[in-house]
């Protein structure tokens, strides 16, 4: 920060070569402080300073008397203004100095050398001891009276932009003015004024210590330069403050022309400053709020709320002297065997009655807390008899219940969703990671499931799978997925899970195979239609029994949702009289490549052609969390969503046959394109191949509508091989072997469902 230098008229002379001084950037400032009112005993001092900007006027001889000024721009500088020129004002100046010394006895009042030789007196700068004190400034409007009250101490900034120039105005050229640094901070350590107007004598006051930060004026009035003479008389008195009685008429006749008054005063710490005008937008006022410490009583959690007396209660009664008979280890009504007592329980059982009798107002919980405190106070030697007794009880308990293992009560355990261990308990699970052989990229994910039901165990390569059923992810989600079961008795297959980002299809394109066509025999037409309104459950059960076949297919579709009622077109059931072809091993799996099926809803009619469709087949949300393990969560839904699958699976433990399925991601918009150029059927024609090599086709006409066809063509051979359920999406193909049990129990459970 540049040091402020006063400029004496008429010729400004700089102290040393310096950057060009800044012009005056402010209008008139006025700072006045009078004596504090007698009602404020805490106010220690008051000060007044009047500053106004005006250049180009000469110093007149009619200056106001008894004006004492000391403006310190920096902590180590004091500006000494010239001596009053009028001889008749010396008496008033001396009286003012005497009054000032009453307030500040530690000050030294020095008179500058008189200009007897006609030389112009120049203000001088003298270093003094820096003081770390602050002065608060408050902006006020100029009223009819110039009296301004002041406070003791404080600190405040009156604006975001501190004024760079403070000027003194007189009847002639300006006596002196100051300029701060380019950052706009004007610091004053000591400002003392004694202003007298006419006959009204204002008592001199002093601002003890302060930092003045003024607001930058809005208009530029004068363009003045700053200059100063170096200190020549060397008035330096250590740490004492230097006060000079200057000319007194600089503020007299022009006080009425002041436009922007500014009162500088001290305020107590933490005081709130309020501006009468519009406060600067960038000003941030911080107020210290005194916090009274409130004593907080920290009550120990181990101490009872009621004072329990233990003076007359014996707390070291031995188990042999207690006279309490040994109670047999009892079971509760559920057959739960209680644990044997430990040492503390043995001790508490003996002393609880006596402690409760001595404190009848205490409840059982408070008695227990006090017993715990008293037990901790005992020494190890005093606790030893109770540990010995607890060991005897434990040995007796082991003899009575040799295979007993402590188990917490089931009612106290937190219930979780059905886990994989509960679903597939007692089954063998072989997880094999492989890579897809052939990938046909699609735009958006759907899910394809391939689960053939075979009489004889057949292991297909990953790329050589049986017909696929694509499971969509519905756009309108509902909290209950549809479950589709296909348990089969004597079949044994493998479940394969495919990477969701890489859908798997046969390595060879789907082809037509020559052979006796059984389309007339196996192509089924619906015999009835059903109009369904949600949330009415839709059930479709196919219980086809063939005496010559050992496999029985059961399919159940349970729809449960809480969506608003919406009417869907017909869903046709499968007639029970439909014949099902006998399954036989494929002689050459790598030669006969069955083409993948379309959407499973196409089993019942026209599949949707758009990504947004009604969830008529799988209305529930598909729970496919991104996980590397396919069964890290329950494979048939997770979370708190209502689903009938976990309950159903609880009946199917150890009853599933081995199935083979591939879970993959396909296109969501379901634009079922021809998988081979050789397919001459419609866009979504599917070829369902018999295990003997006979292929029969199901052709469906697509009208682009979203609803189902009232009279769909259903392939019971495909429905027989369906075993679908949403599962976790893995990062690689997983194989899980699941075993099964007899047929009658499955039929019984499915009939109940």
From Swiss-Prot:
UniProt DNA-binding region: 337-405
InterPro entries, A to Z: HMG_box_dom, HMG_box_dom_sf, SOX30_TF
Taxonomic source organism: Homo sapiens (Human)
Subcellular location: Nucleus; Cytoplasm
Keywords tagged on the record: Activator, Cytoplasm, DNA-binding, Nucleus, Repressor, Transcription, Transcription regulation
Assembly, per entry: Interacts with CTNNB1, competitively inhibiting CTNNB1-TCF7L2/TCF4 interaction.
Pfam families: HMG_box (PF00505)
Region Disordered, annotated ranges: 1-45, 137-161, 514-575, 726-753
SMART domains: HMG (SM00398)
Superkingdom of source: Eukaryota
Molecular functions per Gene Ontology: beta-catenin binding; DNA-binding transcription activator activity, RNA polymerase II-specific; DNA-binding transcription factor activity, RNA polymerase II-specific; DNA-binding transcription repressor activity, RNA polymerase II-specific; RNA polymerase II cis-regulatory region sequence-specific DNA binding; sequence-specific double-stranded DNA binding
Function: Acts both as a transcriptional activator and a repressor. Binds to the DNA sequence 5'-ACAAT-3' and shows a preference for guanine residues surrounding this core motif. Binds to its own promoter and activates its own transcription. Required to activate the expression of postmeiotic genes involved in spermiogenesis. Binds to the promoter region of CTNNB1 and represses its transcription which leads to inhibition of Wnt signaling. Also inhibits Wnt signaling by binding to the CTNNB1 protein, preventing interaction of CTNNB1 with TCF7L2/TCF4.
Protein name in UniProt: Transcription factor SOX-30
